[in-house]
Amino acid sequence: MNAFTPREIVSELDRHIVGQKDAKRAVAIALRNRWRRQQLSEALRDEVLPKNILMIGPTGVGKTEIARRLAKLAQAPFLKVEATKFTEVGYVGRDVESIIRDLVETALTQERDRLRKQVNAKAEANAEERVLDALVGDRASPETRQKFRKMLREGQINDKEIEVQVQDSGGALPTMDIPGMPGAQMGMLNLNDIFGKAFGNRTKARKMTVEDSHAVLVREEADKLLDEEQVVKAAIAAVENNGIVFLDEIDKIATASERRGGDVSREGVQRDLLPLIEGTTVSTKYGPVKTDHVLFIASGAFHTAKPADLLPELQGRLPIRVELSALNAGDFKRILLEPEASLITQYKALLATEGVTLEFPDDTVEAIAEIATEINGSVENIGARRLHTVLERLLEEISFTATDRSGETIVVTRDMVKERVGALAAKADLSRFIL
C-alpha cells in the first residue's frame, strides 16, 4: 500500500472534495496508521488494532465521495457496501460475512494485476511468438520469422486477420443455491469450481486482427506465468493487514428507540456485524480470513435514528466519531468551481464535444448556489446533489439544441437561472403540503 503522509492524503482529498476537514483528517490518520503498523515488530504488530470510524452527517455532504477517493488512494483491498443490503442470518438475503468474501475477490483482482505487470515483458515476448506462429507457422525459417517480426513491431501488419487458439471460458456456468449453508460461500455451489480443470483448459480458434490479438494473448501468457497459489496467499495477507471496508447507510439498520418492534432483522444485522468488526475468522473458498486488522469506516445521515440507537456494543467498536457539516451557499459555489472535475467543468466538456462553448460568469455561479440552498431549505436537504438537479434544469434547453448550435459561445446569465430554475424554488414551499 502507498506510504502517503496524513498531510498528503488530505491534500489529495482536497482536490476533489470541498470542506469536511475533520473527516479528511480522521481517514488520513487511519490510513497512515496502517502503514505505521507494518513497520512494527511482529509481536507488537498483532496487538495494534485499527480504530474504526463512524462518519455522521446529512446526505450529500461528501461521506460517500470521501470513500470513493480513498479507495483510489489506498491501493489496498477496499470495499464500499451499503448496510441495507444485508439481512440477519436465517433471513432471505445476503449475510454480512459476504463483505469479507467480496473483499478477498477485490484483493485477488488487485494482486493479479500487480503480478501481471511484473511478468509483462516475458508475456509480451511469448505473445509475439504466438502471433508469428499464426502468421507464418511454426515451421517457417528463422529468416522469414525475423522478417515478419520486424513488420509486426513496426505495426505494418496490424490490420491483417489471423486465427489464434485462445482459452474458452465458455461463459459462466449457472450457480445453485444450497439452503441452510450460510458459511459455505453464501450457500452457493459454483460448478466452475468443481469442474474447473475440465472446462478451464479448453481452447477455441478465434479470428481477429493482429492488433486486437495482442492484448488477449499478452493477458493469457501473463496468467500462465502466475502462480495461483502465490496470488491467493498474497491477496489474503493484503486483506488481513490492509483491508478497508466502507459501510454506508449504517443509520438505516439502527432502529429509533420509540419505534422498536418487528424490526428483528435490522437489529440482527447489527449483531452480525459485531464479531466482524471486532475480529473473527471468515470462511471463504480460498481459505480462512481473519478480520482483526480490517479497518471499518461506517457512515450514515442519522436523520430519523441517532447514533445512540445503534447497539451499544457496535458504538463501542466504532470509537472515532466525525461529524460532517451541512453545506451552505458558499460551499456550493466552491463545489461548482474548485474540484478538478467540478460540475461546471463536466458540463463545459460535454457540450464542447458538440462544438458549443459554455461560459459561467461569477454572478451566475452565485445564483446557482443560492437557489440550490433555497430549495434545500424549503423541501428536503439533499446537500450537493441538489446542484445536479439545478444544473440539469438550467441547461436542459441548451443540451437539447446543442447539435444545431455548433460553433456558438453561450453565456449562462443570472437571469437564465431565475427564469429556468426560479419556478422550481417557487413551487418548493407548496410541494411539502401536497399529498
UniProtKB/Swiss-Prot annotation:
Belongs to the ClpX chaperone family. HslU subfamily. It comes from Rhodospirillum rubrum (strain ATCC 11170 / ATH 1.1.1 / DSM 467 / LMG 4362 / NCIMB 8255 / S1). Its main location: cytoplasm. It comes from the Bacteria. PANTHER family: ATP-DEPENDENT CLP PROTEASE ATP-BINDING SUBUNIT CLPX-LIKE, MITOCHONDRIAL-RELATED, ATP-DEPENDENT PROTEASE ATPASE SUBUNIT HSLU. SMART domains: AAA, ClpB_D2-small. The keyword Transmembrane helix does not apply. It is found in: Cytoplasm. This is ATP-dependent protease ATPase subunit HslU.
